[in-house]
Amino acid sequence: MFPMVTEFMNYGQQTVRAARYIGQGFMITLSHANRLPVTIQYPYEKLITSERFRGRIHFEFDKCIACEVCVRVCPIDLPVVDWQLETDIRKKRLVNYSIDFGICIFCGNCVEYCPTNCLSMTEEYELSTYDRHELNYNQIALGRLPMSIIDDYTIRTILNLPERKT
């Protein structure tokens, strides 16, 4: 008779434990009901990037001294710097500068170590194209500043991000 009583008690304890686990899961589900949605309607709503966001690289041709520091600090030797030596003034003259964003890992080393600050990171992150070769930007394409998300009247910016509890 005692084994039947202990089995019945174990069954009761397991039932209470299962009900408690179901209740805890239900409370977690209900706590998420009042939160803001994490997803956004992408083409029409965009998040404002942080101050230190590493987006597309902006290049200022006039500031570059063709020192090739950006090539040396790049982990994949990505920037292509073509220059000619001006013999009369004994200085390098920059001819061409290009970066292939299909290969770039956006580490930011080139921007950080540039002695003349001719490289900077922008907030542009939309680099999708149908042709891979369009991701190879020369000095003209790198020199264009992207339109700021805040200034674009057709896009609603999301300022208040839902806070995450860690």
UniProtKB/Swiss-Prot annotation:
It is a peripheral membrane protein. It is found in: Plastid, Chloroplast thylakoid membrane. SUPFAM superfamilies: 4Fe-4S ferredoxins. It comes from the Eukaryota. Residues 55-84, 95-124 form the 4Fe-4S ferredoxin-type domain. [4Fe-4S] cluster 1 binds at residues 64, 67, 70, 114. It catalyses: a plastoquinone + NADH + (n+1) H(+)(in) = a plastoquinol + NAD(+) + n H(+)(out); a plastoquinone + NADPH + (n+1) H(+)(in) = a plastoquinol + NADP(+) + n H(+)(out). InterPro entries: 4Fe4S_Fe-S-bd, 4Fe4S_Fe_S_CS, NADH_quinone_OxRdtase_chainI, NDHI. Its cofactor is [4Fe-4S] cluster. GO terms for molecular function: 4 iron, 4 sulfur cluster binding; iron ion binding; NADH dehydrogenase (ubiquinone) activity; quinone binding. GO terms for cellular component: chloroplast thylakoid membrane. Belongs to the complex I 23 kDa subunit family. NDH is composed of at least 16 different subunits, 5 of which are encoded in the nucleus. NDH shuttles electrons from NAD(P)H:plastoquinone, via FMN and iron-sulfur (Fe-S) centers, to quinones in the photosynthetic chain and possibly in a chloroplast respiratory chain. The immediate electron acceptor for the enzyme in this species is believed to be plastoquinone. Couples the redox reaction to proton translocation, and thus conserves the redox energy in a proton gradient. This is NAD(P)H-quinone oxidoreductase subunit I, chloroplastic. It comes from Coreopsis petrophiloides. The gene is ndhI.
